[in-house]
Amino acid sequence: MSSRYGERRGDPGICDLTFGNPHEMPLAGLVTALRERAMPKHKDWFAYKTSEKESQAFLAQRLQSELALPFEPSDIALTTGAFAAIMVAFHIVLNAGDEAVISEPAWFCYEPMLLAADAVPRKVKLKFPNFDLDLSAIEAAIGPKTRLVIVNTPHNPTGRIYDDNTLKALAELLERASERYGHRVFLLSDEPYRRLRFNGRGFTSPATFYPWTLISYSYGKILLAPGQRIGYLATSPSMPFKERKALSNVMFSTQMALGWCFPNAIMQYAVPDLESLSIDLAALTRRRDSLAAALTKAGYEVLLPDGTFYLWAKWPEGNPQTHWNRLADRNVFVLPGSLMNTTDYFRISFTASDSMIERALPAFSEVTADPISPSLRPIETRPAIGT
């Protein structure tokens, strides 16, 4: 993938459905906020910034309302996006050789980030065909070295939002595992797509049911501005004080040691502005429905997402590598599921423009209509930078 896609990336003639990148101009409100916050109000405006108290207090209040949990400002660590939040979480919870459970298909950066933290990924599969959490598989994967289970909701790449019953059962099995092995198994709830939900779909954070939860969040998704790095790592306010305090005590030093994982001054000043902004959910819904209908008609199996801006679909019968190349031959690029260890599927990002999606649709039909492929070039499975 990386060679063919890399050669064409940015070419106006292609239909780029790979990553969650913008294909239209940024939100006007974002531009205005950054312009206004760039104007210094005092001499320390651009001095070193950690987690600013004003930002922490604002976010604690917003999270109290959004997640119905009594967050305090000290529970919020501002980070340079969810990447940094996740890496900090790995380092404050895991020691060298500790294990973390991942449910696949999964975001392809979890595994290398765990390895970089000297931790050991333990992989289980989501349940087919709806890609729900396989709680039995998760429980079986937890062993004496397991310190962390990672859950991503809404889920990339499938768009699934896990329901309350599933999350309650997950909390119960984590309690059992913690008792069984005599140490706490933490939960990382990765929630960067939390506000990107369709048709009024509700959302419950796993932190509602399991006190030993850390929440990672990024503004890059709701703003469709992944190049402006800001997010946070939130510690559940339900976590017992002793453990909460222990994590808080190492948070600053870990963020510093990992390369100053604090957002820049302008982004922190802009937090109240960012909270009121969103990309056009109605447009995303329209693109989702258009793609899902067209692909289903063309013979693909499509999982309609509850959230995110991705469509997860199964290739028709045949060689997935061949199908991917046939789309690329028609100037359409998607993310192969092999990057997420699920070869028979692929992911479409519908952050693409309406015109780009409209141009891409005939190619999907052509791939299923003609079983003979003119292209047998292999897919290279090194992901480009992106999500």
Model region roles, listed by residue range:
Residues 1-81, 88, 274-278, 371, ...:
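N-terminal small-domain helix-loop-helix segment of the aminotransferase-like
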Residues 211-285, 368:
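Conserved core segment of the aminotransferase class I/II
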Residues 65, 139, 326-335, 339-387:
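PLP-dependent enzyme catalytic core of the Aspartate aminotransferase-like
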Residues 5-8, 66-68, 173-184, 237-244:
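Alpha-helix termini
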Residues 265-272, 284-295, 302-314, 340, ...:
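Conserved glycine-rich beta-strand-loop-beta hairpin in the small C-terminal domain of fold type I
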Residues 43-179, 194-209, 357, 376-386:
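Conserved core of the PLP fold type I
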Residues 14-16, 216, 301-307, 338-339:
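Short beta-strand
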